[in-house]
């Protein structure tokens, strides 16, 4: 299931067209290759690309710290899975809420678990469709990853997700354009409190 979706489906073509029609000039960079920063020295050195993963590049508009000392967020990535029921039972026992950053293709495998997470009062957010490092994808593939993830979550629980976390924290400047267009937020950081959730490490 963890396969990057094709970009030639009618749905993805529509999402691509919507992004193109947004009036925003979205830069296009060559995808990186497997191996991270050492395997991609030119991309890592490109300040225009602003590859956060390789150098911590941020923009002046990015929120990168929690607004108050000792703020933190409890989060879980990569589900739902067969481990989710035990985790939900534990969270209920200790009266904790969390944010589940879910992988779209796994929602198809375990739709009832996503519904249970949501009905128990937990936040649901996007962790892409197939869990790839996003800089290894083309712009069109990123649109497909985000679009299908948004759709499967909305189809399963009736709610549009407002947050997302990129797998492996792999992001660059261009990524915010897609998140704004597909999710309607100014960035994948949906406010200062959310950034505490996004960067929390369970």
List PLM regions with ranges.
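His/Asp/Glu-enriched short active-site or ligand-binding loop at hydrolase and phosphoryl-transfer sites
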Residues: 176, 180-202
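Core nucleotidyl-transferase/polymerase catalytic module
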Residues: 136
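Active-site beta->alpha N-cap acidic-glycine motif
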Residues: 20-133, 141-166, 171-172
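Poly-acidic low-complexity segments
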Residues: 1, 133, 157, 195-201
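N-terminal, immediately post-signal peptide pro-regions of secreted/luminal proteins
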Residues: 1-31
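Generic hydrophobic, helix-prone segments enriched in Leu/Val/Ile
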Residues: 15-20, 48, 181, 202
């Amino acid at each position: 299931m963890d396969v990057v979706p094709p970009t030639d489906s009618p749905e993805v073509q529509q999402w691509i067209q919507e992004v193109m029609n947004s009036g925003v000039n979205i830069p296009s960079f060559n995808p990186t290759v497997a191996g991270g920063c050492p395997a991609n020295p030119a991309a890592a050195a490109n300040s225009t690309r602003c590859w956060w993963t390789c150098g911590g590049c941020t923009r002046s508009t990015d929120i990168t710290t929690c607004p108050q000392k000792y703020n933190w967020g409890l989060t879980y990535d990569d589900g739902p899975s067969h481990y989710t029921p035990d985790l939900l039972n534990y969270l209920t026992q200790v009266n904790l809420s969390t944010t589940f950053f879910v992988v779209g293709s796994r929602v198809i495998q375990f739709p009832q678990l996503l519904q249970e997470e949501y009905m128990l009062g937990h936040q649901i957010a996007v962790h892409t469709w197939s869990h790839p490092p996003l800089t290894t994808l083309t712009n069109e593939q990123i649109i497909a990853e985000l679009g299908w993830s948004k759709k499967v979550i909305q189809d399963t629980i009736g709610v549009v997700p407002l947050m997302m976390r990129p797998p492996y924290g792999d992001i660059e400047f261009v990524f915010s354009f897609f998140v704004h267009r597909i999710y309607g937020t100014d960035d994948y950081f949906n406010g200062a409190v959310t950034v505490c959730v996004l960067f929390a490490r369970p």
